[in-house]
């Protein structure tokens, strides 16, 4: 299925049915009272996050979604039927924005999450509601309310634990193939990857994580060059970035250090928050170099990019904040198991820290609420 990560649609809820003006007509009851029922409510339009949907492609072809109107009220106290709602299934990770106001309507982050995009109009009131002591035969009823209508921008950001970052042809697709069941298109030319690919990396029965391979970046990507910033957004929800560098480019004029610095510069220009995400360095294609040349190129690269963190041969107890360096061959799988093992350990620790932080915040909130509650008299006698 073709991956589509942006779409524009229009949604319109149904109008409420009109209330009825009607009077009882029975034998031997010449002056029957009002019996006009209310109109039914108009159908609403909802968005629902669905983990089995992974693209916005259908919203490129069908751009308008109109819910039905509510049924009008009837005599004999019969209310009009409400119209059915429309539910639009969207991928988890879809951001929905109102095109007219710029408001973020919804951020679909988990399976089954539902958000109302356009609310159906209320049904009108029948004349049964307007009977009074001075007006025994009211002819008044009200029309149904109009339903809401919106023009919306849908934007899909893939949800992944780890994002692969790098220039075209750095070997990102080969890496995700080596460590997961994902099978992206791979060839020896830039921009092989034309849309994000997701792969599930399984460590054991109880541990796995999701890795995202986005199209390669080039200098100027933050301004839209190449495949542009439309793919940088997919990295914003990841918890860890792997900066993959081709240490043995076929083109001898290519400088890996300059390319790596260009990528870092693009991140900084695009989004400071994205630039500040934990980012590990992965030097790829060691299978193309002998041991001595690999050592020399690695040393030259690290000096050129100003790497002042632990080197490959250092014995160092990594913490959560320290960037890490890996030397691998995605093609031969050299070093990939150590890489995914450390990623898994990092993500486990990250989730533990986040859970502890959330629990502490909940406890602090509960204390604050308790302190704001009025103190009640316990009924205990206290002598003056």
Swiss-Prot record:
List the EC numbers from the record.
3.6.5.-
Where does it localize?
Answer: Cytoplasm
Q: Could you name the domain of life of the organism this protein comes from?
A: Bacteria
Residues annotated as binding Mg(2+): 173, 193
Is S-adenosyl-L-methionine found in the keyword set? no
Q: Where is the composition biased (Gly residues)?
A: 33-43
What protein name is recorded for this chain?
A: GTPase Obg
Query: Which species does this protein come from?
Result: Neisseria meningitidis serogroup A / serotype 4A (strain DSM 15465 / Z2491)
Q: Which gene encodes it?
A: obg
